[in-house]
Amino acid sequence: MNAQHIAETLHALGSQAKAASALMARAPSAVKNRALLALARRLRDNTTALQADNARDLERARAAGLAEPMVDRLKLTPKVLETCALGCEQLATMGDVIGEISGMRQQPSGIRVGQMRVPIGVFGMIYESRPNVTIEAASLSIKSGNACILRGGSEAIDSNRALARLVQEALEEAGLPGDAVQLVQTTDREAVGHLIAMPQYVDVIIPRGGKGLIERISRDAKVPVIKHLDGNCHTYVDDPCDVAMAVKVADNAKTQKYSPCNASEGLLVARGVAAEFLPRIGAVYAAKGVEMRGCPETLALLAGVPGATLVHATEQDWSEEYLAPIISIKVVEGLDEAIAHINRYGSHHTDAILTRDHMHAQRFLREVDSASVMVNASTRFADGFEYGLGAEIGISTDKFHARGPVGIEGLTSLKWVVLGEGDIRA
């Protein structure tokens, strides 16, 4: 596909999406829910075929030498597909926020003023690896009354094409336009440049991938961007804490799955509990093959752990997103140092405190500058499905418009509604 053909194709997709967005914006809730349920059914009915398409992507990825954590992100296992189907069903049971009017109040002039929640219109989604994002984005787009143009990574092209076909079939079965969800079929990177530079069609871009991709899009886009940056998440073990609980949570936050952006990459431990806690969590990590990169005090406390892989941490380790069985560990004086460390080195994604002190917990919630802050829970809960959003289109580390897991409301905006009875301004 030459440059001119790519440009023409993207503009055609944009025009079709814009037309479809007008129909989606006024679609009744029951019709949108019918499409979501049809999609859930198709995902279950086509699990075997989808895995065959996915197998081709996995084979190419391994042949190309893609790192195993990245290959893991490509997998469409039965569990992943079932989670996607459940997400669609959960969205279908949720209330429809489109058209809701809030804050209606009488003004001294006589008019009544409120705000109505409406779809954004058309969003472009650019993402790498995870093909399940195709379903998450499509289902949220349907529920929120938007249209979307999806551009997945070349490494998942067969999986994404198969999933996009199912989405369009479900839309058409429900009587909605198939063009409301479109996939950019070419793997040529030039397509991204066109997608992010079509303000006449696209209202917002949502990139989800590596730091380089997101920085490039943020720099070059001619439409607003909702960024999903890296997940350098932290778990802070406070003094006082329930050490047994802290071991359980710190283990889950790191090892339940290594590749997601909400896995803890940094472990901070208050000096008062370090001697008791670190050998216990160190033994757990060692048994699971997790490399521990620590400060000198950490390494001294872990020196007696059988089978432990210990490495001196560098300054870079404190801000690193590993997406692998590696964790940085630092002993800190207490809460103040932990908060300062997280705000300096973290990515403002998700951070947790494990504590018995209510005041410490409240300070952590107020002062840690992250999209999600947690008390006595694993950072792995930072997820739209776990938050009851049905699905998420990403986890925004921005502070404006949407922050944290972006669900239905993150894909809407508010417009002012003014009601009068022939009122005129004096």
Swiss-Prot record:
Keyword Kinase: no
EC number: 1.2.1.41
Similarity comment text for this entry: Belongs to the gamma-glutamyl phosphate reductase family.
Cellular compartments per GO CC: cytoplasm
Taxonomic path: Bacteria, Pseudomonadati, Pseudomonadota, Betaproteobacteria, Burkholderiales
Cell compartments where the protein resides: Cytoplasm
Domain of life: Bacteria
Record protein name field: Gamma-glutamyl phosphate reductase
Enzyme class label: oxidoreductase
Keywords: Amino-acid biosynthesis, Cytoplasm, NADP, Oxidoreductase, Proline biosynthesis
Entries under PROSITE patterns matching the protein: PROA
Reaction(s) catalysed by this chain's protein: L-glutamate 5-semialdehyde + phosphate + NADP(+) = L-glutamyl 5-phosphate + NADPH + H(+)
Pathway info: Amino-acid biosynthesis; L-proline biosynthesis; L-glutamate 5-semialdehyde from L-glutamate: step 2/2
SUPFAM superfamilies for this protein: ALDH-like
One of the protein's GO biological processes: L-proline biosynthetic process
CDD domains: ALDH_F18-19_ProA-GPR
Function, as annotated: Catalyzes the NADPH-dependent reduction of L-glutamate 5-phosphate into L-glutamate 5-semialdehyde and phosphate. The product spontaneously undergoes cyclization to form 1-pyrroline-5-carboxylate.
